[in-house]
Amino acid sequence: MTNTRKNHPLMKIMNNSLIDLPAPSNISSWWNFGSLLGACLTLQIITGLFLAMHYTADTTTAFSSVTHICRDVNYGWIIRYLHANGASMFFLCLFIHIGRGLYYGSFTLLETWNVGIILLFTVMATAFMGYVLPWGQMSFWGATVITNLLSAIPYIGINLVEWIWGGFSVDKATXTRFFAFHLILPFIIMAXVMVHLLFLHETGSNXPLGTPSDSDKIPFHPYYTIKDXLGLLLLXLLAMTLVLFSXDLLXDPNNYMPANPLNTPPHIKPEWYFLFAXAILRSIPNKLGGVLALFFSILILAIIPLLHTAKQQSMIFRPLSQYLFWILIANLFTLTWIGGQPVEHPYIVIGQTASILYFSLILIIMPLVNLIENKMLKW
């Protein structure tokens, strides 16, 4: 009798990706976040679909339609808050997933890493456009400020911004196109996730030791399916606690005021997951310089494989690199805190110092320390 799971053209792909996949026997809970990201993406697409059924992409009715979802639609409030806080869960998992890749040297799987960077940019673009849709004060002014950054591009900047706006300011055309993009991008993300997994399964997963694990593999199911299901349970617990007890904890109160082009909020800031980038952007007094720093603060991930000068892949046996890695994480926390503060005396200097340290650690200090550790292997 033929085994359908192993022979059916469609089931064979699923089987080789999720059931009979040979996986390293020692991957820790830090490897759970890939599946959690998949769960977050699924949640966002499902809740987003239901929200799109009731939302109207028009400046006059967008704010009211979101209010209508929360008040009149059956369980609309939970769908809306699952979607809003689901984005926070998504980015939390995303940052941990990238941090894991940096710590354990997963960036040596070049294709997987590069597709991951493209995914990060796409998810960030999607989240930004989603934040604009409720058409509250912070939505409107966030859209104005961020799109305006493109005007720093020499020669074509102003034309580019007006082309994106669909007019001379953020208006009805902007809301409509942002909704269209926000709707289509998650499906593009899904396609890129398939490519990400395709490249990952070509090489196999990295392991905490950073050594080849071909000699010691175990089937993905049941060992890692049960482990992933536990991670999912904990994520669901965190998400539901957030949604049901303090749904607005991570949001901005200004977004409960309808957009008013005549009244600028005292402090325009993005959601928490973009604050580190906002702090880097603000720390440079020049507009073009700030935009470039913002862009390269994320694109810098692409050159990390080139800066990897260590003889060992993982940081597990490199105490100095570990120390610098945790300084980098603390620095990112500092940048996130600074991004949420007003632009005044102590915060400006702290932000500039943290921004310089961020780039210095990645570009100069860590590669040098890697070389020192290589020398230490001979002592």
Curated annotation (Swiss-Prot):
Membrane-crossing residue ranges in chain numbering: 33-53, 77-98, 113-133, 178-198, 226-246, 288-308, 320-340, 347-367
GO process terms (BP): mitochondrial electron transport, ubiquinol to cytochrome c
PROSITE patterns: CYTB_CTER, CYTB_NTER
Pfam families: Cytochrom_B_C, Cytochrome_B
Residues bound to heme b b562: 83, 182
Cofactor binding notes: Binds 2 heme b groups non-covalently.
UniProt keyword list: Electron transport, Heme, Iron, Membrane, Metal-binding, Mitochondrion, Mitochondrion inner membrane, Respiratory chain, Transmembrane, Transmembrane helix, Transport, Ubiquinone
Essential cofactor(s): heme b
Membrane topology note: Multi-pass membrane protein
Family label: Belongs to the cytochrome b family.
Protein's name according to its UniProt entry: Cytochrome b
Source species: Varecia variegata variegata (Black and white ruffed lemur)
Gene: MT-CYB
